[in-house]
C-alpha cells in the first residue's frame, strides 16, 4: 500500500501533498489503521485561515459564526474518535484507505478534464491541485455525513469552490499581508518570494524558523526508517529540493547524533565519488564497500550508508545516442540487479539513501517495477513549505474571494433610498471625508527615500468601512420612514420641481386589491388638477430635523392642490380632482381632513382611493366623511404605506368604526369587502346583541377567539367584522391587541394563526357628547316597522288641493298641528320637536335635518369620547373612523326625489305622483335595514307597475289635472315576500 501512496503523492502539487502528509501524520498519531477522507477533511479545517473553512463560511452565510465552524471541527473530531485503532506497531505509517484512494483518483481525473494542456500527458504525470483535492474529499459520503451533522451542506461548499475556480483569473502576484495561505504545517520548499511591505529581517527569521521546523520533522521520519528491519532504505521524494534533508541527515550521522540506531558510527559513501557515470560503474562499488566495512568497528555498529543521489540516473542518459527508454532498460536494470546483490551480501551493514523528484520516481516505478522490493526502499514525501504571500498567486486570489471584506458590495450599490436621501447620504460622506483629509495629506509628506516596509501603512479607503455602513444604515432607515411609498412601488416616481399630470387606469369592478395598483404617468393627457410639490407636514419635518445632518436638503412630499391657493380652494380642487362620483355625493365631501389629503398625496394611490371612495359613497352616501377616511386608510395600507410592524410592512389592516349608525357601519363593511376581495364580509358578534347573529352554523358553541382564528385560517383574504368590541370581555380585547402587535392570533387552545391579508373592522357605539339618544330610539322604531308585514299599491286619487309634504314644514308649523294616529300603531310622533335646552337644533324627527355639519364633523374619532380602558386599542388600529348620527330627513328626501324622477321619466309630466306618509315610513325602514339598494328596488318593483300605468293612461286618456297617482299601503294584503324587507311586487289599483 505504501507503493500506492508514493505513486499518488507524486501526482499532487506541493500544497496538496502537504495536506496529505498532514493527514497521514494525524492518522498515525491517533493510531488508526488507515488514513481516510475524514483525516484529510479534519486537516483542512485545522487552520482558521484554511481554504475549506473559508468555503464553508461563504457557502453558508447564516452559519458563518465562529461557533458554527467550531462545531464543524468538533464533529470531525468525534468522527475520528469513532474510527478503529490499528493492531500493528505504531512505528509504521497508516496506509491509505480505499475511500481516500478513490477520492485521490477522482481528483486526478477532474484535474485532467479541467486542464486541456494536460490531456495529452500520461495520467500519472497530471498534478492534482489543492482545490480539486478538496472537491473530491467533499464527494466522500462519510465527509458529507459529518458536515450535515454540523448543519453544513457538502454540495453547497463544493459548488462555492467550483464557482470561485470558474471566476478566478490568474493575476499578477501582488504581495499582501492578509494573504497568509493555508497555515498548514510547513515543510520544505523553494525560496520564498519577498514582500516589499514587510521587514526583510522579519521575513528572513520567519523563513528560517519554518525551514528549521520542516527539516527537523522530515529528519526524524528518515531516522525512524533507517532504524527499521524492513523497508529501511529511504528515498526522499519531492519537488522542493529534498537534498537539503539528505544533507542534514548525513551530517547527523557523521557527528554521531543518531542515538542508538544501527547506523551509528557508519560511513557515508556517495556515488559522486566513484564516477560520474553511475550506471556503468556500479560494479566498482563491491571492492570499495568491502574495504570500508573492514575498517569499521563491527562491535560498535559500524556500517556503510550509500548515498545514491538523485535517482534520475536510473532513467536518463544524457550522453546516449539511443532513446532514453532503451538506455533505462539496458543500463538501469543492470544497476538495479547489482545493487540488490550488494545489499544481500552486506545485509545489516549497508543502507541506501537517495532523492528523487515526483516525475523521476514515477519513471523509476514504470521502468523498474521491482526496484522498491529489490532495494527495500521506503518512499518519504518531503513536505513543501507553507505557501507564503505571492508563492501561489492563484490560490491566494481564491482565498481572497472568500474574505468578507473583499466581497463586500460598495455602499453606494446597496443603498436603497430615494434620490433626495441619496444626495444627503453622499453629502454627509463628503463632510466626513473632508474632516479626515488632513491626516491623509500628512501621510503624503513622509520622506520618499525610506523603504516601503518602514513607511506608515496607508488605508485602502479613506473612510473606515464601519463608518460607511453606519451612515448608510442611517439614511436607509430615514428614507423608509420618511418616504415609504418609494420602497413599496414597482414604478418609483421621483419628485421633480416641474408639474406632472396624473391619470388613472380604466375602472374594473373585478380588479382585486391583492396586488398593488400603481399610478400611471401619461404626460400627454391633461386633467384639471396637477400634482405639485409641497413642504412636509410639521410632524414629519420635525422628525427629519432630528435625524438629518446639518446641511441636508429640505424634504418634500407630494400632496394634492395648488401651493398658492388657500386651504378652502385646495379642498375644492381635491373634490374636483377626485370627480368620479355624482355631484350629489361630492357636495358633502368638504370635511376631508388635511392629514388625509397629505397622506393621499404622499402615497399617490389615486386609482385605488377613487375606486374605494366611489363604491362606498354610492352605497353609504349619508356617511361621506367616513367613506373618505376608510378609502384613504385602506388604500395606503394595501400599498404598504400604513402602520408598520417593526421594520416590515404588514398585510393585515385594522379599522375601528365608532358611532350610533349601526346600519351604516355594516353597509360600509359590506361595500369594502365587495370592492377589495369581491366577497361578502364575515360577521362575528362580540357583544350581547343577537339581531345580526353569527350566521355561520359552524360557529355555534365556540368562543369569540376560536371564531376569529377559524375564520382567518379559512379565509386569509377577507373582511371580518367584529361587532361591539366595546362589549367584549378583557380576555378577548387583550388577545386582539396582541394580534395587532404580532400579526398572529391565538385561539383558546394556544394555536397561533397568521393574520394574512385580512381586513379587520371593529365596531363600537362611542359617539360625540352632542349626539342625541333620539337617533337610537328612532332606529329601534324603524326596526319595529320593518318587522311588520306590509305591501304597497299604486292607485289613482283625486287631488283635493295643494299640499305640502310634512318634511318641508317648519318646526313652528309642525308644533301647531295635532298628533296624527296611524293605523299601523306607530307609537312615536315623527313631528315632535326635540328638547332645546342645550341650544341645539337637532330633533328626533325623521324629517328634520340635524346640525352636525355646522359642528365641524371630520370623520375622525376623538379619544375624548372613548373610555380610558380602550385608549391602548385605539392607538394600535390603522385608523379610527367616527360615523355621524343619520339625517333621516335626507334619506326621506332622497327616496321621494328618486321615485319622482323615475315616475316622470316613464309617465311624463301629464300625471303627478305622491307618496303616502305611512308608505314612505315603511319604505324608509326597508331601505335602511334591508340589503336591497333603493335604485335596485325601484327597478325591480316600481318600474314594472309604472309601465302598466303608462299603458292604461295612453289608452284611456281620462285622467285630468285633478287626478294624481298615489303610492300607499295596501290594506287588503298584509303579507310580504319572505326574507325581504321591501315588497318585490306592487299592486296596480286603477
Curated annotation (Swiss-Prot):
One Pfam family from the record: NBD_SMAX1
Residue ranges of region Disordered? 818-855
What switches on expression, per the entry, is described as:
Up-regulated by karrikins treatments. Under MAX2-dependent negative feedback regulation.
Q: Which PROSITE patterns match?
A: CLP_R
What is the documented disruption phenotype for this protein?
Low seed dormancy and short hypocotyls. Suppresses max2 phenotypes associated with karrikin-KAI2-regulated growth. Smax1 and smxl2 double mutants have substantial reduction in hypocotyl elongation.
Which parts of this chain are annotated as the region Repeat 2?
Answer: 96-167
Report motif location: EAR.
828-832
Which controlled-vocabulary keywords does the entry list? Hydrolase, Repeat, Transcription, Transcription regulation
Tissue specificity note:
Highly expressed in dry seeds. Expressed in seedlings, rosette leaves and senescing leaves. Detected in roots and axillary shoots. Expressed in the primary rosette buds and expanding leaves of adult rosettes, the vasculature of the hypocotyls, cotyledons, and mature roots, in the midvein and petioles of young leaves, the young leaf periphery, stomata, and the root caps.
Spell out the molecular function terms from Gene Ontology. Answer: ATP binding; ATP hydrolysis activity
Q: Has UniProt tagged this entry with the keyword Transcription?
A: yes
| Chain segments carrying region Repeat 1 | 12-83
Self-association state and partner proteins as the record states: Interacts probably with TPL/TPR in an EAR-motif dependent manner. Interacts with TPL, TPR1, TPR2 and TPR4.
Purpose:
Probable component of a transcriptional corepressor complex that acts downstream of MAX2 to negatively regulate karrikins/strigolactone responses. Probable target of MAX2 during germination and seedling photomorphogenesis. Acts probably specifically in the karrikin pathway.
What does UniProt say about this protein's domains?
Contains 1 EAR motif required for the interaction with TPR2.
Q: Which family does it belong to?
A: Belongs to the ClpA/ClpB family.
| Protein's recorded name | Protein SUPPRESSOR OF MAX2 1
Q: Which organism is it from?
A: Arabidopsis thaliana (Mouse-ear cress)
